């Protein structure tokens, strides 16, 4: 039987009694967050290096010695499953002369890792365990040497890393927040499996990609959604969870009657969760997309879209119906994301234009304003 997410004991998040737009108001903001290389360097140092960053699915590192690499904003990290079932993570940087220790994105059953340049060997926790012609080095330089540790944790079937390291990083639970962990947890992502991954190289800031998933104002023009959907979307509820994260719930226009009888947002709405700085969960009862724009440079982004589904036997009629519905919906969503990509290409044409100075935001683009205010506060700290 396919899992059907329901609200359960989670508080009502959507309905006529819910104040659906936070008191942020219309605003303006500079274009600098998208185009200024100095600000990007500050973000790397003060935001991205201190945040929990999505790395991949736990199922990619299910057995001892399985590993994946996490690449983001000029950093590269190796995550490895340990013999005791835990995960370790360390910078993917050879401590000899700097090349990447691991050259592939994923792998299985490693016993140790060998730098391809001079053959230095590392154990599964990142410690140097063998150095060719060791007698030619100062013993003090090699004593206890390791690639620096990175904090790593799992939640919802996802692997997360934090470059502050195990001693200094906040807990992943505190970063995501109880409200999102409880609400998003109703979907039981840890029981889902990877169905598809799409990847694009887009010539804009990763923040422009996040923005596209933080408002529904654009959907009528860009995606050509129906007037009924636009009307229903006016009842979207927005929830600022903490100083960083937020969630919103968009009524599904084809289930408005069901929703009016039972304000169960997990069953009758699109549930949308943003974990700062660059992870977006877009949840439907049938499947979940995770949008992950990875910053490469101030105006270049590696954009990943993960699709996860509930597992089952496709020979089972009930699961076959579920899978067919999911596949059709996924095909439509891929078209929608392609339309978003077309806008990023147009933004790339104008990002250096003298006529591009600022953004004018409506009250319903409050999540954009909140997101960039959060970024500015973290840079200032």
Positions of the model-derived regions?
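C-terminal catalytic domain of Rieske-type non-heme iron oxygenases
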Residues: 80, 86, 92, 153, ...
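Basic/polar N-terminal segments that are highly enriched at the extreme N-terminus
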Residues: 1-19, 380-381
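Short, contiguous pre-domain boundary segments
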Residues: 11-31, 190
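Rieske [2Fe-2S] iron-sulfur-binding domain
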Residues: 60-165, 169-179
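Non-catalytic accessory segments flanking enzyme active sites
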Residues: 29, 33-72
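Short Pro/Gly-enriched beta-strand edge/turn motifs at strand-loop
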Residues: 50-62, 131-135, 272-277
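Generic structural signal for secondary-structure transition and capping sites
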Residues: 48-52, 99, 218
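Short clusters of hydrophobic/aromatic residues that line enzyme substrate/ligand-binding pockets
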Residues: 55, 101, 128, 356, ...
């Amino acid at each position: 039987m396919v899992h059907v997410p329901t609200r359960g004991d989670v508080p009502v998040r959507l309905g006529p009694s819910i104040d659906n737009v936070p008191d942020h108001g219309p605003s303006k903001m500079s274009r600098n967050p998208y185009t200024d290389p100095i600000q990007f360097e500050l973000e790397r140092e003060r935001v991205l290096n201190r945040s929990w960053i999505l790395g991949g699915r736990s199922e990619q590192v299910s057995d001892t010695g399985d590993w994946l690499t996490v690449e983001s904003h000029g950093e590269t990290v190796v995550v490895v499953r340990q013999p005791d079932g835990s995960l370790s993570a360390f910078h993917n940087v050879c401590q000899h002369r700097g090349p990447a220790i691991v050259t592939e994105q994923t792998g299985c059953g490693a016993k140790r890792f060998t730098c391809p340049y001079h053959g230095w060997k590392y154990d599964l926790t990142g410690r140097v365990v063998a150095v060719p012609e060791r007698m030619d080095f100062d013993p003090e330089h090699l004593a206890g040497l390791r690639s620096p540790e990175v904090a790593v944790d799992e939640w919802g079937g996802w692997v997360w890393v934090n470059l502050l390291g195990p001693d200094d990083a906040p807990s992943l639970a505190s970063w995501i927040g109880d409200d999102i962990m409880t609400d998003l947890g109703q979907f039981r992502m840890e029981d889902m499996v990877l169905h598809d991954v799409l990847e694009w190289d887009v010539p804009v800031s990763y923040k422009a990609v996040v923005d596209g998933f933080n408002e529904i104002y654009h959907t009528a023009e860009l995606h050509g959604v129906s007037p009924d959907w636009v009307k229903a979307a006016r009842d979207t509820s927005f929830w600022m969870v903490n100083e960083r994260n937020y969630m919103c719930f968009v009524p599904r226009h084809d289930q408005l009657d069901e929703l009016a009888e039972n304000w169960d947002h997990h069953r009758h709405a699109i549930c949308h969760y943003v974990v700062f700085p660059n992870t977006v969960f877009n949840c439907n009862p049938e499947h979940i997309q995770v949008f992950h724009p990875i910053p490469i440079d101030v105006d270049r982004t590696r954009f990943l879209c993960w699709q996860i589904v509930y597992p089952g036997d496709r020979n089972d009629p009930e699961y076959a119906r579920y899978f067919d519905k999911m596949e059709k919906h996924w095909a439509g969503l891929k078209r929608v994301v392609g339309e978003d990509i077309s806008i990023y290409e147009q933004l790339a044409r104008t990002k250096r234009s003298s006529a591009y100075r600022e953004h004018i935001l409506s009250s319903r683009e409050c999540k954009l304003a909140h997101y960039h205010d959060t970024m500015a506060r973290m840079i200032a700290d």
